[in-house]
Amino acid sequence: MKIIVKLFGLLCIAGGIALFSSPMIATENIKQETKQYITQFKQKEEKNKVNKEDDPRYLEIEEYNEKIYENHQKDFRDVNSYQSSPISLKGFKDGKFGYIKIPKMNVKLPLYVGASDSHLASGAAILGQTSIPVGEIDTNSVIAGHRGYQGAPFFREIEKLDKGDTITIVNPWDTLEYEVTGIDVISPFNTDAVMIQEGRDMITLVTCHPYRSGGKYRYIVYCTRKGTKPSRKGNESYQLLKTSTQDINNEDNVRRGGALLLAFLFLSALAQEIKFFIQESRYKKRSKQL
């Protein structure tokens, strides 16, 4: 019975270590999944490579981008429309469009068309009724990401981004580099803040704010393609609102501290059991000799 109790205690400590370490495990998992996604994406596009001007997928995207610009994104009002894919994109399996790299956040994620729950659980997603990024003016691709999801970071560290930082979009035809030009915090219903800006080639990152707030506000990062006209948007007063940096740091410190403490307790208990086992073995050996 004593042995069972001790084993149960060790298992509880090991379970605690796994719990506190789960964010690191989740982060590593998403990195491996993204690596596999990118490899498959590159292999597929290399195999089917054609000039973009001759690619039906590209022509369909051009037509769509032009249409929503000309109609002033009139359907960009219904929350459900954000989740659905804006166009069929028959050549893109499961909405896969490429990937996004954000060096300042140490993030590389699959990029999907349509912000469905499944897409957002796997990477970043382009909101329906916003532009698809192919390097054209009069476009603004609004790209959403979770502020952390099941332990993986996704857009959790978005507040690390500053003006001038680079964000890269890799689509089937081009690698497009964008520069952060403005930051703001808005209401979830303020679609006007993320509309297309005439004469500009933009992407806008969006995630919940503050961290673990349940989506009270949206943290917005405006980015303009390098070498093109910068965004008119941005609001320096956003810094007066609550920042999540300290909350994120505190959470990380608690997780690391908890994992280290439990690891110490586990190793101490294990060392004690090993010591007891060795002493007991020696005692039995001496008893036999007598």
Segments (PLM) and residue ranges:
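C-terminal single-pass membrane-anchor helix
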Residues: L240-L290
